[in-house]
UniProtKB/Swiss-Prot annotation:
Cysteine-cysteine disulfides: 103-200
Keywords: ATP-binding, Cytoplasm, Disulfide bond, Nucleotide-binding, RNA-binding, Transferase, tRNA processing, tRNA-binding
InterPro entries reported for this sequence: MnmA-like, MnmA-like_C, MnmA-like_central, MnmA-like_central_sf, Rossmann-like_a/b/a_fold
Pfam annotation, one family: tRNA_Me_trans
Function: Catalyzes the 2-thiolation of uridine at the wobble position (U34) of tRNA(Lys), tRNA(Glu) and tRNA(Gln), leading to the formation of s(2)U34, the first step of tRNA-mnm(5)s(2)U34 synthesis. Sulfur is provided by IscS, via a sulfur-relay system. Binds ATP and its substrate tRNAs.
Segments passing through the bilayer: none
Record bears the keyword Magnesium: no
Reaction catalyzed: S-sulfanyl-L-cysteinyl-[protein] + uridine(34) in tRNA + AH2 + ATP = 2-thiouridine(34) in tRNA + L-cysteinyl-[protein] + A + AMP + diphosphate + H(+)
Gene name in the database record: mnmA
Residue ranges that the Swiss-Prot or TrEMBL entry lists as coiled coil: none
Family under the similarity heading: Belongs to the MnmA/TRMU family.
Protein name: tRNA-specific 2-thiouridylase MnmA
Amino acid sequence: MIIKKNKKIIVAMSGGVDSSVCAWILKKQNYQVEGLFMKNWEEDDQEGYCSSTKDLLDAENICKKLNIYLHKMNFSSEYWEYVFENFLKEYKKGNTPNPDILCNKEIKFNMFLNYSIQELKADYIATGHYARIKKINGKYLLLKGIDTNKDQSYFLYTLNSIQLRKILFPIGHLKKNKVRNIAKKIDLKIAKKKDSTGICFIGPKKLKNFLSLYISEKKGDIVTISGRVIGKHSGVFYYTIGQRQGLGIGGIKGEYNIPWYVVEKNIEKNILIVAQGSYNKHLMSIGLIAKNINWINYDQLSFPLSCMAKTRYRQKDIICKIEYINNHHIKILFDCPVAAVTPGQSVVFYVSDICIGGGIIESRLPLL
């Protein structure tokens, strides 16, 4: 996307490699660049799940080196209200939500975008996402990042055309190794800093341990498809469809020595249902029902619609057909059965490299 050189751009600075190189690229191109560090989580818990102190220090040092001003904003209360409370509510229902997608929707490309444009008088915001924006026939489209291993368009499907007009993804056309090489070349101390992984407010800690701070344990049985009790769980909401680790079962007399996987969660009966093998038929789905659909400037939107889909991040694209149910729901039918389709996660749609939208998985259509 071509923009005039005298424009003011606010870069979301996280203290990491991607946002730092993003700022450097724009600075080198002679734009009026400023940074903004967002604090989205209050660090009053003794476990220290999400300490932003080191990241802020890194962001300050980077901005000093690049000679750009760094703003600081605390969006913790907004994050709690619009992201974290939803996260807990969905887990209590037995779903597995993706707070990073909701954070993009409610915080980064809503609160941060609006603050930058309205209060800081910026023309654009920029982030270090591996995605691209192209203006084609007068419409702004969201595309996958060039680096297929790092593409983050999956997390951005909630964007709309008005937002896309004001967003820049300066590293979307680069591969990760190139970004790190740039960071080394310009002598950034964070050039070897590891990428952030996992849910942003949990960090490297175990999800189950974190959830137990907010959701009380409710012990129950782990049962096989046939109804045989083979173990105990501490709360069905602590587990996700397709989970293998942390079940505490194995070596069951009369059963094959094959790993067990969660295939269903029954909240009402408080039981966790498991089966053996990562591709057992009970884990497979022929499709799903999705809600909260967002479409991004797609001209050929008519049903049934044939396209590609992802039901989780970094999954290979799946051939599918989308059928209209009503204004709030659609049905997705896969060309081949898909494992571990998980309610609460997002399904995102593509035509070639263009992300045309997505929605929340409400339920799966089992193979059986």
